[in-house]
UniProtKB/Swiss-Prot annotation:
This is COP9 signalosome complex subunit 3. The gene is cops3. Residues 197-365 form the PCI domain. Pfam families: COP9_hel_rpt, CSN3-like_C, PCI. SUPFAM superfamilies: Winged helix' DNA-binding domain (SSF46785). Residues 402-423 are annotated as: Disordered. Component of the CSN complex, probably composed of cops1, cops2, cops3, cops4, cops5, cops6, cops7, cops8 and cops9. GO terms for biological process: ubiquitin-dependent protein catabolic process. It comes from the Eukaryota. Belongs to the CSN3 family. It is found in: Cytoplasm; Nucleus. InterPro entries: COP9_N, CSN3, CSN3_C, PCI_dom, WH_DNA-bd_sf. GO terms for cellular component: COP9 signalosome; cytoplasm.
């Protein structure tokens, strides 16, 4: 091993033993070029370091190995990274979250290129646990995990992370990028869409769209298109975005989504034939955007919406009559829709198989059973917790030096303008 590398190993050991993590971070940041020049000796360096005791030194070496243009032995490197992430010292890693996250991004990109996304899911779950100060902290690796779950069509591993409300962002020594935030909410929305949890999907797409922005983001544009489609499936209309949404959404993103706005306008007419015609007209656009599946679900939801409208007019109706009123192909398709809607709790009805009549019923829920009361209690507890969290965050902002300085500056400007008006 070259003398410079020996010095690197000795410094890593010494600083780790002394607990001087800040100085060790400075060392590994400066050693990238040295390590890159000695690629053939890096496995020897890894052998001289202990993963648990010298986590930052091992991290620096693995990061450089993964940065190589052509990785000669990917399987060996993959095993080294897998072992490192599972056994490294989390307290040490939090001093170099930027490099640690960078290693996770490199791993993700390599697995995506090799079309092996499933292999990285459990590794990234461990990486997130190592990085986080608490479970409600968002890291850039969350977006990587969601991307791999989407590509592997294995959604469930990401759900426990998506279900947690994020209260904080891991700054990663200034390396955290807005792209990671947008990707997390965009990919998360896609995962919830795949799981048919449209309410949560809509929330995630809304977070991506309403992120403060000064320029058009392609991620925000794609999230906006899916937001329109999921809105129609869930509510039968496009939900209005909050007032704090950036002006670029109305100025630039909406004009780039004309096909989706047309679809929403036709959807509002409750006419399936017109909607099918529009879907055929813009089929290339929907296919290019990978939204064909969602568009088909929009068409299906319009049939369901029209069936729900019939429940407000009729007490009983034949399947044949329902099919003609809703523009379905026949009584068999009408029966299929009604059965699915009964199963999903979207309507309350029964079908008489003898005469093919559908009887519509009132909602049987009386809101007076123990399970419902327990659910109400749980919802009230959530509201109380949210109120406490908002008070805590408000207090943090009130004593934040930057906020106080800005507030004082604004007050001085107001006093100055009043004084000048009196003079």
């Amino acid at each position: 091993m070259a003398s410079a590398l020996e010095q690197f190993v000795n410094n890593v050991r010494q600083l780790s033993a002394q607990g001087q993590m800040t100085q060790l971070c400075e060392l590994i940041n400066k050693s990238g070029e040295l390590l890159a020049k000695n690629l053939s000796h890096l496995d020897t360096v890894l052998g001289a370091l202990d993963i648990q005791e010298h986590s930052l030194g091992v991290l620096a070496v693995l990061f450089v190995k993964f940065s190589m243009p052509n990785i000669p032995d990917f399987e060996t490197l993959f095993s080294q990274v897998q072992l490192f992430i599972s056994t490294c010292n989390g307290e040490h890693i939090r001093y170099a979250t930027d490099t640690f996250a960078g290693l996770c991004h490199q791993l993700t990109n390599a697995l995506v290129e090799r079309k092996q996304p499933l292999r990285g899911i459990s590794i990234l779950k461990q990486a997130i646990d190592k990085m986080q100060m608490n479970t409600n902290q968002l890291t850039s690796v969350h977006a990587d995990l969601c991307q791999l779950c989407l590509l592997a069509k294995c959604f469930k591993p990401a759900v426990p992370f998506l279900e947690l409300d994020m209260m904080d962002i891991c700054k990663e020594n200034g390396a955290y990028d807005a792209k990671h935030f947008l990707c997390y909410y965009y990919y998360g929305g896609m995962i919830y869409t795949g799981l048919k949890n449209f309410e949560r999907a809509l929330y995630f797409f809304e977070q991506a769209i309403t992120t403060p922005a000064m320029a058009v983001s392609h991620i925000m544009l794609e999230a906006y298109k899916k937001y329109i489609l999921v809105s129609l499936i869930l509510h039968g209309k496009v939900q209005q975005l909050p007032k704090y949404t950036s002006q670029i959404v109305g100025r630039f993103i909406k004009p780039l989504s004309n096909a989706y706005h047309e679809l929403a306008q036709i959807y509002a007419t409750n006419n399936p034939a017109e909607l099918r015609a529009l879907v055929n007209k813009h089929s290339e656009t929907f296919t290019r955007d990978n939204n064909t599946g969602l568009v088909k679900q929009c068409l299906s939801s319009l049939y369901k919406k029209n069936i729900q409208r019939l429940t407000k007019t009729f007490l009983t109706l034949s399947l044949q009559d329902m099919a003609s009123r809703v523009q379905l192909s026949g009584p068999q398709e009408a029966e299929k829709y009604v059965l699915h809607m009964i199963e999903d709790g979207e309507i309350y009805a029964s079908i008489n198989q003898k005469d093919g009549m559908v009887c519509f019923h009132d909602n049987p829920e009386k809101y007076n059973n123990p399970a419902m009361l327990h659910k109400i209690d749980q919802e009230m507890l959530k509201c109380i917790e949210l109120d406490e969290k908002l008070k805590s965050m408000d207090q943090e902002i009130t004593v934040n030096p930057q906020f106080v300085q800005k507030s004082m500056g604004t007050q001085e400007d107001d006093v100055g303008s009043k004084t000048s008006s009196y003079s």
